[in-house]
UniProtKB/Swiss-Prot annotation:
It is found in: Cytoplasm. Heterohexamer, formed by a dimer of trimers. The hexameric TusBCD complex contains 2 copies each of TusB, TusC and TusD. The TusBCD complex interacts with TusE. GO terms for molecular function: sulfur carrier activity; sulfurtransferase activity. The active site is at residue 78. It holds the Pfam family DsrE. Its EC number is 2.8.1.-. InterPro entries: DsrEFH-like, Sulphur_relay_DsrE/F-like, Sulphur_relay_TusD/DsrE. It comes from Salmonella newport (strain SL254). Part of a sulfur-relay system required for 2-thiolation of 5-methylaminomethyl-2-thiouridine (mnm(5)s(2)U) at tRNA wobble positions. Accepts sulfur from TusA and transfers it in turn to TusE. GO terms for biological process: tRNA wobble position uridine thiolation. Belongs to the DsrE/TusD family. This is Sulfurtransferase TusD.
Length: 128
Protein backbone atom coordinates (compact mmCIF):
# COMPACT_ATOMS: atom_id res chain seq x y z
CA UNK A 1 0.00 0.00 0.00
CA UNK A 2 1.00 3.60 -0.56
CA UNK A 3 0.94 5.80 2.56
CA UNK A 4 1.33 9.44 3.53
CA UNK A 5 1.79 10.71 7.06
CA UNK A 6 0.77 14.05 8.56
CA UNK A 7 2.61 15.18 11.70
CA UNK A 8 1.08 17.94 13.85
CA UNK A 9 3.23 17.57 16.97
CA UNK A 10 6.59 19.18 17.65
CA UNK A 11 9.78 17.13 17.74
CA UNK A 12 9.92 17.35 21.52
CA UNK A 13 7.21 17.77 24.14
CA UNK A 14 4.70 15.33 22.64
CA UNK A 15 4.80 11.74 21.44
CA UNK A 16 3.28 12.51 18.02
CA UNK A 17 6.46 13.04 15.99
CA UNK A 18 8.39 10.11 17.42
CA UNK A 19 5.37 7.82 16.98
CA UNK A 20 5.06 8.99 13.38
CA UNK A 21 8.72 8.23 12.72
CA UNK A 22 8.40 4.75 14.25
CA UNK A 23 5.30 4.15 12.12
CA UNK A 24 7.19 5.31 9.02
CA UNK A 25 9.98 2.81 9.68
CA UNK A 26 7.45 0.03 10.33
CA UNK A 27 5.74 0.76 6.99
CA UNK A 28 9.00 0.61 5.09
CA UNK A 29 10.13 -2.54 6.91
CA UNK A 30 6.87 -4.26 5.90
CA UNK A 31 7.38 -3.36 2.23
CA UNK A 32 4.85 -0.54 1.98
CA UNK A 33 5.57 2.69 0.16
CA UNK A 34 5.77 5.93 2.13
CA UNK A 35 5.25 8.69 -0.40
CA UNK A 36 5.54 11.70 1.87
CA UNK A 37 5.37 13.17 5.33
CA UNK A 38 3.57 16.50 5.73
CA UNK A 39 4.39 18.57 8.81
CA UNK A 40 1.63 20.95 9.87
CA UNK A 41 0.94 23.27 12.82
CA UNK A 42 3.46 22.53 15.62
CA UNK A 43 4.82 19.70 13.49
CA UNK A 44 6.92 22.18 11.50
CA UNK A 45 9.33 22.33 14.45
CA UNK A 46 10.57 18.91 13.27
CA UNK A 47 12.37 20.78 10.47
CA UNK A 48 14.28 23.28 12.63
CA UNK A 49 17.99 23.03 11.85
CA UNK A 50 18.79 24.75 15.15
CA UNK A 51 17.16 22.08 17.33
CA UNK A 52 19.90 20.69 19.55
CA UNK A 53 18.83 17.91 21.91
CA UNK A 54 21.00 16.81 24.82
CA UNK A 55 23.65 14.23 24.02
CA UNK A 56 21.66 11.47 25.72
CA UNK A 57 18.43 12.27 23.83
CA UNK A 58 17.29 10.95 20.46
CA UNK A 59 17.85 13.50 17.67
CA UNK A 60 14.46 13.37 16.00
CA UNK A 61 15.13 16.18 13.51
CA UNK A 62 18.17 14.39 12.07
CA UNK A 63 16.26 11.09 12.13
CA UNK A 64 13.65 12.60 9.79
CA UNK A 65 16.46 13.83 7.54
CA UNK A 66 17.95 10.33 7.51
CA UNK A 67 14.55 8.91 6.47
CA UNK A 68 14.63 11.31 3.52
CA UNK A 69 18.18 10.47 2.43
CA UNK A 70 17.96 6.70 2.91
CA UNK A 71 14.45 6.08 1.57
CA UNK A 72 13.66 9.11 -0.60
CA UNK A 73 10.60 10.03 1.45
CA UNK A 74 9.46 13.60 0.72
CA UNK A 75 9.42 15.75 3.86
CA UNK A 76 7.04 18.65 3.23
CA UNK A 77 6.37 21.35 5.79
CA UNK A 78 3.48 23.79 5.57
CA UNK A 79 4.99 27.11 4.52
CA UNK A 80 2.38 29.23 6.32
CA UNK A 81 2.75 27.31 9.59
CA UNK A 82 6.54 27.37 9.25
CA UNK A 83 6.81 31.11 8.66
CA UNK A 84 4.58 31.81 11.67
CA UNK A 85 6.92 29.72 13.81
CA UNK A 86 10.21 31.08 12.46
CA UNK A 87 11.19 28.15 10.22
CA UNK A 88 12.49 29.48 6.89
CA UNK A 89 14.59 28.38 3.92
CA UNK A 90 17.17 30.46 2.05
CA UNK A 91 14.62 31.74 -0.47
CA UNK A 92 12.19 32.98 2.19
CA UNK A 93 15.03 34.45 4.26
CA UNK A 94 16.14 36.49 1.25
CA UNK A 95 12.60 37.54 0.39
CA UNK A 96 11.91 38.65 3.95
CA UNK A 97 15.30 40.30 4.47
CA UNK A 98 16.30 37.92 7.25
CA UNK A 99 19.99 37.15 7.88
CA UNK A 100 19.82 33.36 7.67
CA UNK A 101 17.69 30.27 7.20
CA UNK A 102 17.06 27.40 9.62
CA UNK A 103 15.31 24.76 7.52
CA UNK A 104 16.95 21.36 8.02
CA UNK A 105 18.27 19.89 4.72
CA UNK A 106 15.90 17.27 3.33
CA UNK A 107 12.77 19.24 4.21
CA UNK A 108 10.83 21.35 1.70
CA UNK A 109 8.52 24.29 2.33
CA UNK A 110 5.22 23.36 0.66
CA UNK A 111 1.64 24.54 0.51
CA UNK A 112 -1.41 22.57 1.52
CA UNK A 113 -1.52 21.38 -2.09
CA UNK A 114 1.19 18.85 -1.18
CA UNK A 115 -1.11 17.40 1.48
CA UNK A 116 -4.06 17.40 -0.92
CA UNK A 117 -1.99 15.60 -3.56
CA UNK A 118 -0.89 13.00 -1.02
CA UNK A 119 -4.53 12.47 -0.03
CA UNK A 120 -5.47 11.86 -3.65
CA UNK A 121 -2.54 9.64 -4.64
CA UNK A 122 -2.09 7.49 -1.52
CA UNK A 123 -4.19 4.62 -0.23
CA UNK A 124 -3.95 5.87 3.35
CA UNK A 125 -3.11 9.15 5.10
CA UNK A 126 -2.30 8.72 8.78
CA UNK A 127 -2.20 11.71 11.14
CA UNK A 128 -0.09 11.95 14.27
Amino acid sequence: MRYAIMVTGAAYGTQQASSALQFAHALLNEGHELASVFFYREGVYNANLLTSPASDEYDLVRAWQKLNTQHGVALNICVAAALRRGIIDETEAGRLGLPSANLQPGFTLSGLGALAEASLTCDRVVQF
